[in-house]
């Protein structure tokens, strides 16, 4: 019996100890929250013990914000500037422009140099075509206004040089066979064909004399030990028939320039 009465008192203590809520308590709590800075006052259900769990869940889902933070206006967005280093370095914005200008100037120089190189190459090829084309059978057969390509011009020049070399070898052999053991020296100086090799070129076999023996001349100079030009009658031609000369000038008339006559060449031989 005593135990039952004690248990009833223990169960009834929380209900008797709770003070009943008055109407002014809700307004007082709202004014206190306004003074602290929170806009949302606590709900009336938070005062009762039955709605304690619902209030805690609502406070966790919707946190209270200070009044000053909610009423503070947002600051306007600042326009993006040229960069943080633009104030410290006044010429920072001009540096990319100067670098780009330098690159453009370098590109112009490279283009002009390449253009000049191609122009020089075209001029050289045109000069080579002027020398080679008269000896080109393909050009004579083709269209007259058509220009040979660069590779065709170079191949034709190579063949032309090889042909000239073989002709030179044949000339040496002919001079060596026709002159005999006492072969005269045929010296060429200043010819356009052999302009790349300065000095005199020995065509006929024989030792080269001292430098003072080689007289410089603008055109062909011949030093022959043969007698002056003399003709002998062909066999069966009669006394008044045409004669044949055996000197080197008459044998190779194409080596003597047209500006020099036979008398001038013979006068030069006698010196």
From Swiss-Prot:
Q: In which tissues is it expressed?
A: Expressed in the brain, in oligodendrocytes. Strongly expressed in oligodendrogliomas, while expression is weak to moderate in astrocytomas. Expression in glioblastomas is highly variable.
* Annotated region (Disordered), positions in chain: 38-117
Compositionally biased intervals (Low complexity):
43-61
Q: Which residues cross the membrane?
A: none
Q: Which Gene3D superfamilies match?
A: Helix-loop-helix DNA-binding domain (4.10.280.10)
The Gene Ontology biological process terms listed for this entry are: axon development; neuron fate commitment; oligodendrocyte development; positive regulation of transcription by RNA polymerase II; sensory organ development
Task: Kindly give the SMART domains that the UniProt entry links to this protein.
Answer: HLH (SM00353)
Q: Does the keyword Acetylation apply?
A: no
bHLH domain sequence ranges: 105-164
Give a yes or no for keyword Lyase in this entry: no
Q: Which Pfam families does the UniProt entry name for this protein? A: HLH
CC per GO annotation: chromatin; nucleus
Q: Which subcellular locations apply to this protein?
A: Nucleus
**Principal location class:** nucleus
| Function (record text) | Promotes formation and maturation of oligodendrocytes, especially within the brain. Cooperates with OLIG2 to establish the pMN domain of the embryonic neural tube.
What PANTHER family does the record point to?
Answer: BASIC HELIX-LOOP-HELIX PROTEIN NEUROGENIN-RELATED, OLIGODENDROCYTE TRANSCRIPTION FACTOR 1
What's this protein's name? Answer: Oligodendrocyte transcription factor 1
Q: Which organism is it from?
A: Homo sapiens
Q: Which gene encodes it?
A: OLIG1
